[in-house]
């Protein structure tokens, strides 16, 4: 059956959408959709009117994509939210698109990526996505905690070199265990 790849480049208040089929067939050149119920419902109507299988791909950048992804999932469409790095690597290798970031090109890139990775596209679910984000936040938290300890030790060592014995002048207030 026909494959319709919908690339959505989400930004604040609006998205740019492009629809491709295999063999470079352009179903819809990049067009803009505002994030209001009327225009989003219009997009849903358009997507649902396509013959064949349809998959929607967007990147998780910023926080704007979440609203759009959840809206499109709620009406029963296949939505995949992918890591921007994957798309960037893919487009650098496979597409000879002139450099320069434009939303129009990005929506086409996303649709092309969707066609290329058609069978591996993960279905977006709010739960699994939340888990992914929590893992990332946890990783970041741990990195910053390590960095904080490193910087404190560095500061103590510098203080020690500049003013030997100065560390003994400071008392650390008793801390309650976390």
Label every model-predicted segment.
Residues 2-21, 110:
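Gly/Thr-rich phosphate-binding beta-strand-loop-beta motif of the actin/hexokinase/Hsp70
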Residues 12, 62, 86:
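Short, glycine/acidic-enriched loop or turn micro-motifs at the edges of active sites
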Residues 13-38:
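Short glycine-rich, Thr/Ser-proximal phosphate-binding strand/loop in the N-terminal lobe
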Residues 38-55:
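Short, basic/hydrophobic alpha-helical segments
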Residues 57-67:
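Acidic, metal-coordinating catalytic cores used for nucleic-acid/nucleotide bond scission
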Residues 73, 80-123:
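Short alpha-helix plus adjacent loop in nuclease-associated cores
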Residues 138-178:
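Glycine-rich, often acidic, oxyanion-interacting loops/wings at catalytic, nucleic-acid
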């Amino acid at each position: 059956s026909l494959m319709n790849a919908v690339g959505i480049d989400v930004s604040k208040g609006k998205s740019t959408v492009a629809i491709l089929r295999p063999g470079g067939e352009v179903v819809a050149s990049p067009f803009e959709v505002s994030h209001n119920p009327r225009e989003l419902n219009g997009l849903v109507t358009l997507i649902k009117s396509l013959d064949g299988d349809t998959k929607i791909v967007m990147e998780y950048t910023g926080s704007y994509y979440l609203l759009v992804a959840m809206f499109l999932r709620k009406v029963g469409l296949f939505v995949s939210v992918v890591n921007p790095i994957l798309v960037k690597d893919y487009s650098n290798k496979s597409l000879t698109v002139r450099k320069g970031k434009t939303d129009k090109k990005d929506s086409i890139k996303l649709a092309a990526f969707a066609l290329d990775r058609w069978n591996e596209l993960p279905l977006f679910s709010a739960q699994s996505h939340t888990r992914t984000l929590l893992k990332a936040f946890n990783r970041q938290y741990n990195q910053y905690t390590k960095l904080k300890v490193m910087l404190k030790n560095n500061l103590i060592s510098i203080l020690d070199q500049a003013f030997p014995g100065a560390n003994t002048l400071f008392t650390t207030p008793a801390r309650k265990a976390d």
